Design a protein with these regions (language model features):
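Mid-domain alpha/beta scaffold segments of enzyme catalytic cores
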Residues: 1-130
Length: 130
């Protein structure tokens, strides 16, 4: 089994919309799925995407995310971030993003960041959060 080491100094872009199917080996899956249906050797990330935010069920979604963090196959938090094209108010996006940053740090998991037209805000948050 491989071990992930915490390294907060590097930024790695793993974003893709056109991934080739995995024919052998291990795969990282980043989408909505039922964790009990996962096969051994498959890993996933979980997060609250800015496009999926509403003011009405945010706490429920955060609670679901907290519960998933105990799963051994969850290897990253995200996609989480800021998106000026999303319908959710920026204030809500920032609050939920901060919560996900805290969770990724608490569980020592990488954070997959989504950022659209909000790089200045994201960098300001990085300075604020540390």
């Amino acid at each position: 089994m491989w071990k992930m080491e915490r390294n907060t100094n590097n930024i790695l872009d793993i974003h893709t919309h056109k991934a080739e199917p995995v024919s052998a080996g291990k795969a990282i899956i980043n989408r909505k799925l039922a964790t009990d249906a996962l096969c051994e050797g498959y890993f996933y990330s979980a997060g609250i995407h800015p496009w999926d935010l509403t003011e009405f069920d945010t706490e429920r979604r955060l609670e679901c995310l907290r519960e998933q963090l105990a799963e051994k196959q969850l290897v990253a938090v995200g996609e989480a971030g800021l998106d000026k094209l999303a319908a959710a108010p920026m204030q809500l996006q920032v609050a939920v993003f901060k919560e996900q940053v805290e969770l990724s740090e608490k569980y020592e998991l990488p954070l997959i960041i989504h950022c659209v037209k909000a790089m200045d805000e994201l960098l300001a948050l990085r300075k604020e959060i540390g």
